[in-house]
Amino acid sequence: MIQQESRMKVADNSGAREVLTIKVLGGSGRKTANIGDVVVCTVKQATPGGVVKKGEVVKAVIVRTKSGARRQDGSYIKFDENACVIIRDDKSPRGTRIFGPVARELRENNFMKIVSLAPEVL
């Protein structure tokens, strides 16, 4: 689960390396976000020459969490790190590549472009 002030790695080539969560979107007073949820973040580390610069405020969708997510069949999916993909307002990614596996829950939340770019969907 991701909450305010949580740091995540960025799993795309938009230029950002690490982001800090400012706000969890989707409801008044919502505290935590899980896989497939959209959060507002600020870029804490960035690569030189990237599309996204350090200090920029961006929207991101969570693609991997350490705490994991419960599936409909009762199974759980957990990852080794917390990671996100920076998106535009129309849910399309700002980068052109996705690094690492992403969860199947993104397909249910209509992030089809991210699912198609990902090397593996678990």
Swiss-Prot record:
InterPro entries, per database record: Ribosomal_uL14 (IPR000218), Ribosomal_uL14_bac-type (IPR005745), Ribosomal_uL14_CS (IPR019972), Ribosomal_uL14_sf (IPR036853)
GO cellular component annotations of the record: cytosolic large ribosomal subunit
UniProt keyword list: Ribonucleoprotein, Ribosomal protein, RNA-binding, rRNA-binding
Gene Ontology MF annotations: large ribosomal subunit rRNA binding; structural constituent of ribosome
Superkingdom of origin organism: Bacteria
Xref: Gene3D superfamilies: Ribosomal protein L14
GO biological process: translation
Family assignment from sequence similarity: Belongs to the universal ribosomal protein uL14 family.
HAMAP family in alphabetical order: Ribosomal_uL14 (MF_01367)
Quaternary context: Part of the 50S ribosomal subunit. Forms a cluster with proteins L3 and L19. In the 70S ribosome, L14 and L19 interact and together make contacts with the 16S rRNA in bridges B5 and B8.
Function of the molecule: Binds to 23S rRNA. Forms part of two intersubunit bridges in the 70S ribosome.
Protein name according to UniProt: Large ribosomal subunit protein uL14
Lineage: Bacteria, Bacillati, Bacillota, Bacilli, Bacillales
Gene that encodes it: rplN
